[in-house]
Amino acid sequence: MIAHRPFIPTLLLPLLALTATAQVPEAEPTLSGEMTLSQCITYAQRHSPDLIPARVQMEQLEVQEESARMNFLPDLNAGVGQNFSFGYTQGHDKVLRKNNGSSTGLSVSTSLSLFEGGARWWALKSSREALESKDYILDEVEDRIALTVASSYVGVLLAQQIVEVAEENLSLSLMQQKRVDAQVEAGKLAPSEQLKMRTQVGQDRLALNEAKSDLDRAMRVLRLDMGITEEGETFTVPQEDPESVIARLERESPYHAAPEWTNPSLRLAQLRYDLSSYDVKRAKAGYMPRLSLSGGYSNGYFYYFGDEIPNKSFGDQLKSNGQYTIGLSLSIPIFNRGQVRASVRQAELQRESALGQLIQQQFSEQRNITLATADLRKAEESYRLSKDNVEVAQESLDMTEKEYNAGRITAYEWEQSKNKLIGAKSQYLQSVYTRLLRSINLTYYLTGTLPR
């Protein structure tokens, strides 16, 4: 991530469990023991396969910039040729003589483009600006990876708490089963009530097994989002009390954060529009004449077979056959079947398309902020309602427990009250971690900070 981004809000610090200061580089995370959200994201941003296309694209920008610079240098070419000729020639005395021989030619030539309508200059300027902004390509991918891993990580935290609720549910059912068994033995309840309770315990065991399976699946999703495919590489996610998470969220709200940054996706859209303007100028350079400078040196050696024509020595021929050339070439476009005009129009259409994409990206950023704000407010309201619901359900179960012990209600009514409490706790946990994830998203959209 680029250096100008602000630090992580304090509401995320305990969740991330950062152990190093901002001045100390973070060590390479290893897949062992407990891994915090920060470590999971750091690992994913170094090992995710999503980084491969971004790195290739960044390398392509470097190659394009180097190629644009090299276009200002002259061309240098060397050539060598060997020819053989056979036949007769007629001299001044009307006599035919054999003219069989060979010729060897050597040449070195160079050319330099002096003016091309500014095409090379615009290409260089475009490639340099693209290269200077290459970090945003990596930032965009890293941010997407971080948001994905954060969502998966929060999913694991929620799944862990759901398992605890399922275990509590089973524990209550087992306790109730013992009481029902005792009442059946005492003749206070029919044996059918005992069978009903056993059925309920079996259902609660199944619910616990499903909760553990969901936790295992959530861990697998997190591993895949981190780029981990080897089954032997294991780690765990530390559990945290939901109320401690809410306490931190209450201390710092992202609502008042000023959007003082620009999303990498928006910067890339702006860059594509700026570069498209250079493409239009490069295309219009095709209307301009082209001036080039060329020069060269050539030499040759001739050898005649036979005695009819005497051969000069190799050294004498090199002294007398050498030739230097230098010249200017001006090419003025007159008619090229409308190719330049078509290229200009195509470049202008691409610029209009890039402008449309930029406007769409700007709208998308504002839309994300608006919806993220609404989602967080909804999550906060759901949290408050679900918390009140848990308190009411717990109070109801306590009262039901007393009435059941007094013999005023049946085991079925007690079971109904217990199920309402378990359902209320599940909704409460869902609201807690939904609020946490919504807070992470809104903080990112407003400030660009992400768990690192």
Which residues are covered by each model-predicted region?
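Bacterial Sec-pathway N-terminal export signals of envelope proteins
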Residues: 22-77, 81, 230, 237-279, ...
